[in-house]
Amino acid sequence: MKELLLLYSGGLDTSVMIKWMNENLGYDVSTLTLDIGNNDLKSIREKAEAIGAVETFVEDVKQEFSYEYISKSILANGSYEGYPLSTALARPLMAKKAVELAEKHGFEAIAHGSTGRGNDQVRFELGIKALNPSLEMLAPVRDWNMLRSEEIEYAKKNNIIVPSDGKYSVDENLWGRSIEGSEIENMSLPVPEDAYEWLVPPWEAGPGEVIKLEFSNGLPVAINDSDFELQNLIANLNIIGGRNSIGLIDHVEDRITGIKSREVYECPAAEIITYAHGYLESLILNKHEISIKSFLDSKFSQFVYNGLWYDPAMKPLIAGEEILNSEINGSISLKLYKGKIYFNGSKGANFSYNSNVANYSTYEFDQKSSKGFIDIFKNDTVYSILARQKAKEEALS
């Protein structure tokens, strides 16, 4: 019998697929589940085995996810339409692990549970094909147009446990939690409070708190003078930010497939780190570096969102980000208060910002030199206007 590896989350779609692909497509199905900050690996493995998975592979990849994927997004202030790419960042890692396992154990195909409406089908299949074009890809929910009602009926018929918390479609990892479906799709309604898990609503948040973050080469390394590995620092900031209602995003997102979708995200650590990192950049980098970096940031975010992590162009993008971020060192203090982040002071040895120059009360900057600068700086604008005026006058004469 043919062998297949299924990216398995433990949810309804992928649980049904274990049995369905065996019965209808003739595959022996093995499963792969990764802990990227979201999964109870033991219970998910037991569920896959009970349904009929031949082998169940599980792996804790939180450290790799943090240092090889999230870290690159921190350097690039990764964001798509205001969302910090939490789901999108996890997909290339999942694709990589699936390909490695398929090559090691001889699986002929890899399957995922994505629908034909969403972004993940693109991200999984682009990533896997980029790493190994010979592997066959299967997406039963999409390719055989499986309806949720049909999946539930099939699950009941085959004694597959249907998750009881299925009101919303949720994707969760260290960098954020995304929620969609149910009342969230109704644009006439606010986000139901039962959709939140990581943070409290702003009106229920406490009196606020001040934190200090230390950055080295563009990455956060300490909270309040205590050093952390990146994955633990993120986990701590998710707790701190969550109790202060930091990181709630409710927006309409333009998917790769051209569909608009209302998406709700909880991303406390991502919002805190991105704010702090961006503020330090403004203090340290000059305007030319910031201009170049803004371009790199935008391209990086587009590539990640669109599933192009393994495109050759990502290497120079990331290399440029790493060069610019080698200067991003220092500490920054932030006040977190009822969903808002406020700058509370910063220290560093290489700040381009110079208070003595910016200060109107000192003489360190020679203001007289500005006149000569303006005389030269105006030339491009003034000469082009004069040339066009002259051309119009000659045309009328």
From Swiss-Prot:
L-aspartate binds at T115, N119, D120. Its EC number is 6.3.4.5. It comes from the Archaea. One of its GO terms (biological process) is argininosuccinate metabolic process. It catalyses: L-citrulline + L-aspartate + ATP = 2-(N(omega)-L-arginino)succinate + AMP + diphosphate + H(+). One of its GO terms (molecular function) is argininosuccinate synthase activity. It is an enzyme of class 6 (ligase). Its main location: cytoplasm. ATP binds at L7, Y8, S9, G10, G11, L12, D13, T14, S15, G113. Pathway: Amino-acid biosynthesis; L-arginine biosynthesis; L-arginine from L-ornithine and carbamoyl phosphate: step 2/3. One of its GO terms (cellular component) is cytoplasm. It is found in: Cytoplasm. InterPro entries: Arginosuc_syn_C, Arginosuc_syn_N, Arginosuc_synth, Arginosuc_synth_CS, Arginosuc_synth_type_1_subfam, AS_cat/multimer_dom_body, Rossmann-like_a/b/a_fold. L-citrulline binds at Y83, N119, R123, S169, S178, E253, Y265. Belongs to the argininosuccinate synthase family. Type 1 subfamily. PANTHER family: ARGININOSUCCINATE SYNTHASE. This is Argininosuccinate synthase. It comes from Thermoplasma volcanium (strain ATCC 51530 / DSM 4299 / JCM 9571 / NBRC 15438 / GSS1). The gene is argG.
